[in-house]
């Protein structure tokens, strides 16, 4: 019985240490599958989001943005939807990604085809966008199909990677990890309504604690996308709140700092 109480106390202490309140803003918001928005890039950018996601397919030498290969269009390239608009914003902001010099932005690129080949094309393409690769508050974070972790150091500083908790990273590898993402369903089936079950809270906060011990921010994908869930994720200390509802999350974060 004493052992059980000790375990619960430790878990509760972990939850308390993680769930310390901090100031949240739209910098803590992640636009999931952003290209499916009515105005890709601009809606999330204008809302001040800290992370914007684009899925890419390398087809005939072009990086095409789509959720499924069957949905690709030659007009919807990564360059047209994201790189060119970013370059224009950085020019307007005199070298910064946002008018606020302290505000950062991750462009999370989910490679749906071979990651090494896609990265070769991406790094070559980015060389023609000097303002992007020299912008200190902009990072390109590679997710999905990625190179081997041992090869991360071969890529330039402006290319970083989306990490996974189960991988045993060396310090050199870890230095190339910008964020750790994980599938929400591994830890909970809670749908964002009513209260988060205590057992799920323990699983989620234990994982969050492990990521924070690595000094990395965390994001869950396929998580509930409701105001109640957003509030819970804030209390748990999730660094990037995943959403398809840009305007709704923007309003929530502005009202509930």
Predicted feature locations:
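Bacterial Sec-dependent N-terminal signal peptides
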Residues: 1-24
């Amino acid at each position: 019985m004493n052992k059980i109480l000790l375990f619960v106390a430790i878990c509760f202490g972990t939850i308390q240490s993680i769930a310390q309140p901090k100031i949240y803003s739209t910098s803590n918001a992640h636009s999931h599958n952003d290209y499916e928005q009515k105005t890709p890039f601009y809606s999330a950018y204008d809302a001040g989001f800290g992370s914007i996601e684009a899925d890419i397919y390398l087809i005939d030498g072009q990086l095409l943005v789509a959720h499924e290969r069957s949905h690709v269009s030659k007009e919807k390239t990564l360059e047209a939807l994201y790189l060119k608009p970013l370059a224009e914003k950085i020019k307007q902001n005199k070298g910064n990604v946002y008018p606020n010099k302290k505000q950062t932005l991750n462009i999370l690129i989910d490679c749906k085809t071979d990651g090494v080949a896609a990265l070769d094309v991406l790094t070559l393409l980015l060389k023609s966008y000097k303002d992007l690769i020299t912008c200190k508050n902009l990072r390109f974070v590679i997710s999905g199909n990625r190179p081997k972790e041992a090869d991360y150091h071969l890529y330039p500083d402006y290319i970083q990677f989306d990490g996974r908790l189960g991988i045993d990273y060396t310090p050199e590898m870890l230095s190339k990890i910008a964020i750790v993402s994980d599938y929400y369903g591994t830890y909970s089936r809670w749908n964002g309504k009513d209260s988060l079950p205590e057992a799920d809270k323990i699983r989620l906060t234990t994982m969050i604690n492990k990521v924070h011990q690595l000094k990395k921010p965390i994001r869950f994908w396929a998580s509930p996308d409701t105001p109640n869930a957003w509030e819970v994720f804030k209390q748990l200390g999730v660094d990037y709140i995943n959403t398809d509802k840009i305007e709704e999350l923007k309003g929530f974060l502005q009202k509930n700092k």
